[in-house]
Amino acid sequence: MKRLIVASTLLLSTALLNAAEDSKVTYVPAATVAKGGSLATAPNLSITIANRKEPGMVEVHDKETDTFYVLDGSATIVTGGTMVGGTDTGPGQHRGTDIKGGQAQRLAKGDVVVIPAGVPHWFKEVPSSIDYYVVKVIAE
C-alpha cells in the first residue's frame, strides 16, 4: 500500500509541477479520490481516476500525452499502429474501431504506460475491470 501511495504521489506531483507556471496548489481529499472522476485540471493538464469494465474505442489525441497508472485490475491495451474506422469526435480527438499493426501489452496493478500525442491506443480486453489514474498533458 505504501508503494501505491508513493507512486501515486510522485505521478501527481510530477504532472502538477509540469503544469502552468502560475498554478495554484491543488488538494484532493481521500473521499473525493475514492469516488473517482476528475481530480485536478489546469490549462495544459488533467488528472482523473478512471474505471473500465469493458473494452473501449480506439482513441487518438493530437495534442494530449496520456499517462496511465494502474491502481487495480487488469486489461490488454494496444498502442501504435494505424487506427481503423476513424472519425473525428472533436478538435484533435479521433475514435476508431480497431488498430492495425499495434502492439498489445497486458496491464496490471502498479503498471504505468505513457502514450505520446498522436499514438493510437485502445483497451482491447478488460477481463473484469481496471481502475487507473489518467494524467493528460496537453501541448500548446
PLM feature segments, named:
Residues L4-V6, S13-K63:
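A short, N-terminal "cap"/entry segment at the start of jelly-roll beta-barrel domains
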Residues I49, I77-T79, Y132:
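Short hydrophobic/aromatic-rich beta-strand segments that constitute the beta-sheet cores
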Residues D62-K63, T67-M83, T89-D98:
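Short, conserved beta-strand element in jelly-roll/cupin
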Residues M83-G85, S129-I130:
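Short, surface-exposed beta-strand-loop junctions and turns on beta-sheet-rich folds
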Residues L107-E125:
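Conserved metal-binding segment of the jelly-roll/cupin
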Residues S128-E140:
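A short hydrophobic beta-strand segment most commonly corresponding to one strand
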